[in-house]
Structure formats: structure tokens, C-alpha cells
Regions:
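Assembly/oligomerization interface modules of large self-assembling protein complexes
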Residues: 1-74
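Sequence/fold signature of self-assembling virion shell proteins
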Residues: 1-22, 26-27, 123-153, 187-289
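Short helix/loop capping segments that flank catalytic or ligand/cofactor-binding pockets
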Residues: 69-70, 105, 187-189
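Alpha-helical scaffold segments that mediate packing/assembly in large oligomeric complexes
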Residues: 72-164, 288-289
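Short coil/turn segments at secondary-structure boundaries
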Residues: 108-114, 172-181, 201-204
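Ordered core of a single globular domain
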Residues: 149-196
Length: 289
């Protein structure tokens, strides 16, 4: 599991198939003390399901083809040696894993099993799951349109409006995150500069920064929301669950071998992963209309 979202979400290992997130909810009803008792209050156990998708990455590398594109310095001397190993393995695997992690970061938000995109149709992402739940708070009650969009002139008002709509039960939480696309984050940074809110800006804040007036809410730039439907989400980080079938130390498991029969170097990555939220009614969802 990787991408910006995975840095904040709860990682649930051992997910091989549909796996439940067990959610306990209870309330309290005070009564007058006395010699008798009457039971009151309600405790319920509800379940949300992580439905993981099986993901695989397969690639065949022909050293003959690569030798025409890379200098002799990068390729080992000798025809046989060239074929039996990747001379730039560290560079190759680092980039391959980074690309997989970036693609997962996008799928965790934009995934849709009905999508025509191979990178998005392995499991449903949060965009689809939160909308389908139908209980998230509408963060756009004034119906800002797609024609208006997000600008440095309205982004602060949009984010503050979402903060004011946050459910009372989580208003004081210390892990509240406003997930925005990088373009929206840049608009927020520009708005802070235009408004001379420089005391809210610290050096090196390229991925996240606090929301004006709400020190317990962090605005997070998430590349996984790039080229999406441009929704913005306000929720607790602890409300997000990413399911994986491998523990963290094995999450970057890569199998590679040289096949002497095909004279090809083969690479395979295979895993299961999925995502969901525990409390969709504790989310503020902003969608342009």
C-alpha cells in the first residue's frame, strides 16, 4: 500500500477476500440514581467491507533490445552475461515500485470495477464508495458549479465552509484531514500568499499545511486525486482502512528471474489490496455541481 493516502490510513493486513471493518457504536443515557434500575442506551456493531482486488504486474525484458538503447558502460561485457541479469537492477526496481505505488495511490481514490482503465478497475475506490454510502455531509450546500471551479479566490471559503459542516462528534479530533488534489492545494497556497497569511506557512510545507482558523485540520495534497472528479474530502485519518494481503515488510515483494528457454528476464509483482471507510456519515464531501 502506498501513495499519500496510505501515509494516513489504517493498514489492515491479511486481507485475502472480502474483509469486514468491525465498527462498535454506543451511546450513554443518564438516569436518576435509586434502588431500581431500567436499562437504557444502545450499543450496535456494524460492519463495513473491504473488497480487495487481485493486482499483478508482469514484464519481460530482453537484454538484446536494451543493449541498443543503453551505452556499453551500463551493460556488462559478454553476450551471455548481458542476457542473464539486469545491469541496472537498482534503478529499474526503484522506478517500477514507485510507479506501482503511485498507481495504487490513484486507485485508492478513483478505483471503479466498472472502469475501462486497467489501473482503476481492480477494486472500488473512496470516490465511489463514499458516494454509494449516501450518508456523507454535503460540503457544497451553495452549489458551486464546475463552471466556477476551484480558484485561489474561492478555495479558502470552500475549505472553511467544509470545516464548519463537520459532524459534532468528530469536531475535536486530532487527526482531521482535508484531502485535496495538488492543483487545489496550490490554489490554497496562492490564496494564503494573496491574503498575507504568511504565519500559516512554514518552510518545506509542500504536501500539507494547517487550515486557517482550524489548527486541528490539516490540508493534504494527494496526487491520487489528480485527474479525478475534483472532489474534496474532510475526514479523520483513522476512518480510512486500506486492506493488504501482505504485512508491511513484504509489501514490496518482487519476483524476478532469467528464463533460459525464452532468453528473457521476467519480473512479476502480485498482491491484493482494497480500501473503505468505517464511518461514511463522519465525512464531509465537497463535489462541484
Amino acid at each position: 500500500a502506498q501513495g499519500q493516502l496510505a501515509k494516513y490510513a489504517q493498514i489492515q493486513p491479511g486481507v485475502k477476500g472480502d474483509t469486514t471493518i468491525n465498527v462498535l457504536s454506543t451511546d450513554v443515557v443518564f438516569q436518576a440514581d435509586g434502588c431500581s434500575r431500567t436499562a437504557s442506551g444502545t450499543t450496535t456493531l456494524t460492519q463495513r467491507t473491504i473488497s480487495p482486488g487481485a493486482v499483478a504486474v508482469h514484464e519481460d525484458l530482453c537484454m538484446d533490445s536494451l543493449s541498443a538503447k543503453y551505452t556499453a558502460v551500463m551493460l556488462k561485457q559478454g553476450l551471455t552475461a548481458e542476457k542473464e541479469e539486469i545491469p541496472f537492477a537498482e534503478l529499474y526496481f526503484a522506478q517500477k515500485i514507485a510507479k506501482v505505488q503511485d498507481a495504487l495511490g490513484k486507485a485508492y481514490w478513483q478505483g471503479d470495477t466498472a472502469s475501462g482503465s486497467a489501473n482503476l478497475n481492480k477494486f472500488d475506490g473512496l470516490d465511489k464508495l463514499i458516494l454509494a454510502a449516501g450518508t456523507a455531509v454535503n460540503g457544497n450546500p451553495t452549489a458551486i458549479t464546475t463552471g466556477t471551479g476551484y480558484t485561489s479566490g474561492n478555495i479558502i471559503g470552500i475549505l472553511l465552509g467544509m470545516a464548519e459542516l463537520i459532524p459534532e462528534a468528530i469536531a475535536g479530533a486530532d487527526d482531521l484531514k482535508l484531502f485535496v488534489a495538488p492543483a487545489q492545494f496550490l490554489s490554497y497556497q496562492r490564496a494564503l500568499a494573496d491574503g498575507n497569511y504568511f504565519h500559516y506557512v512554514s518552510e518545506g510545507q509542500t504536501q500539507s499545511m494547517p487550515l486557517i482558523g482550524f489548527p486541528n485540520i490539516e490540508v493534504v495534497s494527494d496526487p491520487g486525486l489528480t485527474q479525478s472528479n475534483n472532489n474534496i474530502y474532510l475526514m479523520r485519518a483513522s476512518n480510512i482502512y486500506i486492506g493488504v494481503d501482505l504485512p508491511d515488510e513484504e509489501a514490496n515483494d518482487v519476483r524476478s528471474w532469467y528464463d533460459p528457454n525464452d532468453r528473457i528476464y521476467k519480473v512479476t509483482m502480485a498482491f491484493r489490496t482494497g480500501v473503505n471507510v468505517a464511518f461514511p456519515d463522519e465525512i464531509v464531501r465537497f463535489a462541484l455541481v
